[in-house]
């Protein structure tokens, strides 16, 4: 009876699909002695730390310890490693791809783990927050820009000049290319957060709708099995999106690094 009451209260006070994305303090400490210093652990910080902890556990489980035959964890991680390595090397080039692959691999695992954690019911989707994804995208684009200037100097601005551009259209096209280059900061982070955010909101709306149907009577309970099956299928689709968005993020990152290195 208490469980049912708590469930009813949950859907009553969490009717908004945006409630699940609120950043809240899990633990907070106020220290007036140090000048009203507020120390807190938020839900996004907690789940990001949990993601790092899970990553450590997965790496320990996938370690072969010099065994000839690896376990299922090591085989899956090696397959993922080989797939990403092929993508990065083909996207950049065999030489520079080896240099930047560790960073891109760590970035992929970080995004993927946090995407999957967000799929767990009553957890927190860290990658649905624009503050996190924009921090990643701005840092990556800024780093690629610094890399380009470090290698090419002022010649890096030739990236903004399209090949075979007529002289009369040069100012306009350079302006368009410059705006397009700046838009990378927004588009890279926006794509990831928007896909995760929209998927979780839709699942929340469908779950609330299904719950209201199934608690309206015995007949409606069986009718609610239809949208419940759709929710289960859509959850499987969201798992696929979690992998796809992580892959898209690192593919675009590899492309930005390639542009900075090769100026095209």
From Swiss-Prot:
The keyword Repeat does not apply. Its main location: mitochondrion. It is a multi-pass membrane protein. It is found in: Mitochondrion inner membrane. The keyword Nucleotide-binding does not apply. F-type ATPases have 2 components, CF(1) - the catalytic core - and CF(0) - the membrane proton channel. CF(1) has five subunits: alpha(3), beta(3), gamma(1), delta(1), epsilon(1). CF(0) has three main subunits: a, b and c. This is ATP synthase subunit a. It comes from Podospora anserina (strain S / ATCC MYA-4624 / DSM 980 / FGSC 10383).
């Amino acid at each position: 009876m208490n469980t049912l009451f708590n469930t009813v209260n949950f859907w009553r006070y969490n009717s908004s699909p945006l409630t699940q994305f609120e950043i809240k303090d899990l633990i907070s400490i106020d220290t007036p002695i140090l000048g009203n210093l507020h120390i807190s652990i938020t839900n996004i910080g907690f789940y990001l730390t949990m993601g790092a902890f899970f990553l450590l556990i997965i790496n320990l489980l996938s370690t072969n310890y010099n065994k000839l035959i690896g376990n299922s964890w090591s085989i899956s991680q090696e397959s993922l490693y080989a797939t990403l390595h092929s993508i990065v090397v083909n996207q950049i080039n065999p030489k520079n791809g080896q240099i930047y692959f560790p960073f891109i691999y760590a970035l992929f695992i970080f995004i993927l783990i946090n995407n999957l954690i967000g799929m767990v019911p009553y957890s927190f989707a860290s990658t649905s927050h624009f503050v996190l994804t924009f921090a990643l995208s701005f840092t990556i684009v800024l780093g690629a820009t610094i890399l380009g200037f470090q290698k090419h100097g002022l010649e890096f601005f030739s990236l903004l000049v399209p090949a075979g551009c007529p002289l009369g259209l040069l100012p306009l096209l350079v302006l368009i290319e410059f705006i397009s280059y700046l838009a990378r900061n927004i588009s890279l982070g926006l794509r990831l957060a928007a896909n995760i955010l929209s998927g979780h909101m839709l699942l929340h709306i469908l779950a609330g709708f299904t719950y209201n149907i199934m608690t309206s009577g015995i007949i409606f309970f069986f009718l609610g099995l239809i949208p419940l099956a759709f929710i289960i299928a859509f959850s499987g689709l969201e798992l696929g999106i979690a992998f796809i968005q992580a892959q898209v993020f690192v593919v675009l990152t590899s492309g930005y690094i390639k542009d900075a290195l090769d100026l095209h």
